[in-house]
Curated annotation (Swiss-Prot):
The record marks R29 as: Transition state stabilizer. ATP binds at S69, G125, A126, G127, L128, S129, S130, S131. One of its GO terms (biological process) is galactose metabolic process. GO terms for cellular component: cytosol. InterPro entries: Galactokinase, Galactokinase_bac, Galactokinase_CS, GalKase_N, GHMP_kinase_C_dom, GHMP_kinase_C_sf, GHMP_kinase_N_dom, GHMP_knse_ATP-bd_CS. SUPFAM superfamilies: GHMP Kinase, C-terminal domain (SSF55060), Ribosomal protein S5 domain 2-like (SSF54211). The active site is at D175. The keyword Nucleotide-binding applies. The keyword Transcription does not apply. Catalyzes the transfer of the gamma-phosphate of ATP to D-galactose to form alpha-D-galactose-1-phosphate (Gal-1-P). It comes from Vibrio vulnificus (strain YJ016). Keywords: ATP-binding, Carbohydrate metabolism, Cytoplasm, Galactose metabolism, Kinase, Magnesium, Metal-binding, Nucleotide-binding, Transferase. This is Galactokinase. It is found in: Cytoplasm.
Amino acid sequence: MSELIQNVKTSFEQVLGYAPSHIIQAPGRVNLIGEHTDYNDGFVLPCAINYQTVVAAAKREDNLVRVVSVDYGNAVDEFDITQAITFQQDKMWANYIRGVVKCLLARGYAFTGADISVSGNVPQGAGLSSSAALEVVIGQTFKVLFNLEISQAEIALNGQQAENEFVGCNCGIMDQMISAEGRENHAMLLDCRSLETESVSMPEEMAVVIINSNKKRGLVDSEYNTRRQQCEEAARIFGVKALRDVTIEQFNEKVAELDEMVAKRARHVITENDRTVEAAQALRAHDMKRMGELMAESHASMRDDFEITVKEIDTLVEIVKEVIGDQGGVRMTGGGFGGCIVALVPPALVDDVKATVAAKYQAATGLKESIYVCQAKDGAGLVEML
């Protein structure tokens, strides 16, 4: 993170002409288990990772917000918080920031303008929530600069609202919540209905290894929407608000009445919720053998029932599983049809995993992977006052 801090300080001073007063960060995240459960009111188990979005900031006495994006060649966006805050067609990055500020104002928070320089190293397009980290770090920045009485959960909800209503992207609450509330060496069990969270301790030395298949993700939106509709149809047949409310026993009694495809989709969600709650218990007990079994079951369910994995992802999972055996776990993470796998790997095996993947993945698929070796880290907060 030190390089990011240096970059935002330097760009702040160069472009805005004076020194910032605060450095704030918010992390990306990876979901360890609980896939496609969020929009079914279920459970997820993400952790924050040591890839962050960092801000250098200072408050202004007037109503102007000026933002410098280091990652877009020090491009600048500027808006007045007393005027209508509008969507910028030609500066997509700026809309996340505008949306967060607009939503904070709509929620009744009072503040003046600010100068902000922002940079991040959360890999974009890998499904590690670079957009949520940006939304949360901006909310955190206004909290810190103006001593706003806003909880971390509300910073997360505000970020989600900005993405849904201002940016126009329909996301669940997981990404923002873990970025805002993460804890070092802990995962977070999140109930996507009540928004209750529970910290789950992880074995301290355990590496969180994320491997991007670099398989271009096609069909994601249309397939995602289809899955969502199938889940809603299943909930309707069971007469419940969401699949969260169906037990596996109830499912088995009624499975004959369901369309075969809808039954497979529902079975994934219902069993995945049970797995996620049990995974939190296994992780807390540092029972990596059980955690690994649950992650393997999750992957098989995504592959066979939810049908969102692809050959490249299945290949990666098999390669990693060979190396870690029952000392850790591995599965696809994220929306599917490409993207990343996540593995919990004992530190002694990290180099083996990297070497084996390098030796086998490209040979099998023609694609070169990207590997990120992470630790579970703290959520958003003040890094330093200058």
